[in-house]
């Protein structure tokens, strides 16, 4: 089976400081997302459609960062930079599936905010448990279609050029540069596919938030307006970070960015974004911070009783 070797940001091993930074980001991302899932599960105040969808977003972030970072860290420790063809295919498929699922989930989450703010009286019926699970299933289905469509085609190209992927994981643009055949037709098809993958959820987000802004503008109570803006602003920040980086990589023509810039942007939305998401959603959310304080208080009280 062919073996593909890859670089991690450069042809030389990364410094211990950079390795420690990536490890810290990875551990922080896993821990913060796990804590958020646990809080949403154990605190009855967080048993709402919005927090259920946030827990699903955290689950995807855990899987997303775990697809790439552990392999990169192990390679640094073992001083090896090789990945098998099967391993590269699996990483490629999981990356596309999870990224696509996150695109669709972020888009559908805006519908939840639209219903909560614009149709609050019908919110329990329109965002029932069944509807929430359908949203989750639709996001997974959309991501899986992306993975199943693009992965077989990408990996069937003959890699008869250099075996070194100028990237830190098996991302599509970096893999296509290794092919010795003409991939222009496929790149055009992939470009159209990516446009649709981004445009459909983004259109849903734009439509939802346009209606939300109109509703917020018409609100007479300042407190209700402030709460609505605070609830939606966190989601918009996450959408801007994730969609912005993805559009730069897959929509902007390759002539406008270098491989080094591609690696930097990819590191941002594959490594940093999963860590930032729970922080962005939690730091400004009184319900989540209140639930965390409640759990910490219980742990401290339990420790004092045990010690006594």
Swiss-Prot record:
Query: In which compartments does the protein localize?
Result: Cell membrane
Entry membrane topology: Multi-pass membrane protein
> Which UniProt key words apply to this protein?
Cell membrane, Disulfide bond, G-protein coupled receptor, Membrane, Olfaction, Receptor, Sensory transduction, Transducer, Transmembrane, Transmembrane helix
Q: Which residues lie on this side of the membrane: Extracellular?
A: 1-17, 75-88, 152-188, 257-262
Question: What does the entry list under GO cellular component?
Answer: plasma membrane
Q: Which residues lie on this side of the membrane: Cytoplasmic?
A: 41-51, 110-130, 210-235, 284-308
Q: Name one GO molecular function term.
A: olfactory receptor activity
Where, by residue number, does the polypeptide cross the bilayer? 18-40, 52-74, 89-109, 131-151, 189-209, 236-256, 263-283
GO BP annotations listed: detection of chemical stimulus involved in sensory perception of smell
InterPro entries, alphabetically? GPCR_Rhodpsn, GPCR_Rhodpsn_7TM, Olfact_rcpt
Give disulfide pairs as residue numbers.
88-170
Family affiliation: Belongs to the G-protein coupled receptor 1 family.
Q: What does this protein do?
A: Odorant receptor.
Which protein, by its recorded name, is this? Olfactory receptor 2T7
Source organism of this protein record? Homo sapiens (Human)
The taxonomic lineage of its organism, from the top, reads: Eukaryota, Metazoa, Chordata, Craniata, Vertebrata
